[in-house]
């Protein structure tokens, strides 16, 4: 029996599965075959929810006596766009000059391929693992993230599963393998403000109520002053206005409605609830500011809606998990990785409620881009890091 010890072969098999979210595309099946070669038992639960596609997931475990390590990630990928723009077909896993091209090469089929190879090498060298390893893999990370990791964790917990630590194989390194381990993430909160006015002719503003004046005032209150100056482990919270819309194609008509959407990435100064309260307080004060609405005595009429559920800020403090991974990275790459909380959200935000979690994978420079690609040397390097981590984690 040949174990899946080669990360290049593993990744090629996964890339050739067109698992554009929410499609499974054969990727979970390919992964399950690799894991069963190593004696893993596997389940493929499908989860559903209103107004979202059904999603197939995979939970596989190889049990032993000792701590339980979870590797988590996703096999779904973003669409490739126009395939004619690619140097190599996005689902062909072609190699040129020591580089493999394909959608998901770094985000994050590459990380999965390397961890599979690392486990296989450990088993080949040492036999059984001194503990348990599980793979918690979803097909719903690039999509709404409703029927994926969050439900798979609860499904596993209800069946008696518990974990001592988790690694998420997202591409954490900005420039080169070994740059960065993510030990936490900022929270994320999104909302939409709607201001209602009265439509009218631009030449007769006294007969109308321009909602643009109101939306500008409200948005300004969220942009200044700054929410905070950052903390010891997190950069300053940052709010970005992502859309301002009036739906008006005529230049001589005052619109009857204006909307603005925003997203804020926040640090551990705030909880989602305290941040929502701060935003509401700012908007309420600004609604009474009529400097841009001369002659108007009534407050700005607006509605605030929160979009999707917020993700909460977290920071992992587990010394064994972080220390062992840091030492493994340094041993293979020769450099000490930065411990960071930068970047966007990931499914680690769900895992943190079940066990300590960190993120470490490949270099993310080409994720979601045309010609997404990974150096074969990085696949081997990451596999060696994971293999060393597994050996040291289980002692």
UniProtKB/Swiss-Prot annotation:
Its EC number is 3.5.1.18. Zn(2+) 1 binds at residues 74, 107, 170. GO terms for biological process: diaminopimelate biosynthetic process; L-arginine biosynthetic process; lysine biosynthetic process via diaminopimelate. Its cofactor is Zn(2+); Co(2+). Binds 2 Zn(2+) or Co(2+) ions per subunit. Zn(2+) 2 binds at residues 107, 142, 368. Pathway: Amino-acid biosynthesis; L-lysine biosynthesis via DAP pathway; LL-2,6-diaminopimelate from (S)-tetrahydrodipicolinate (succinylase route): step 3/3. GO terms for molecular function: acetylornithine deacetylase activity; cobalt ion binding; succinyl-diaminopimelate desuccinylase activity; zinc ion binding. Keywords: Amino-acid biosynthesis, Cobalt, Diaminopimelate biosynthesis, Hydrolase, Lysine biosynthesis, Metal-binding, Zinc. It catalyses: N-succinyl-(2S,6S)-2,6-diaminopimelate + H2O = (2S,6S)-2,6-diaminopimelate + succinate. It comes from the Bacteria. The active site is at residues 76, 141. NCBIfam families: dapE_proteo (TIGR01246), PRK13009.1 (NF009557). Catalyzes the hydrolysis of N-succinyl-L,L-diaminopimelic acid (SDAP), forming succinate and LL-2,6-diaminopimelate (DAP), an intermediate involved in the bacterial biosynthesis of lysine and meso-diaminopimelic acid, an essential component of bacterial cell walls. Homodimer. Belongs to the peptidase M20A family. DapE subfamily. HAMAP family: DapE. This is Succinyl-diaminopimelate desuccinylase. The gene is dapE.
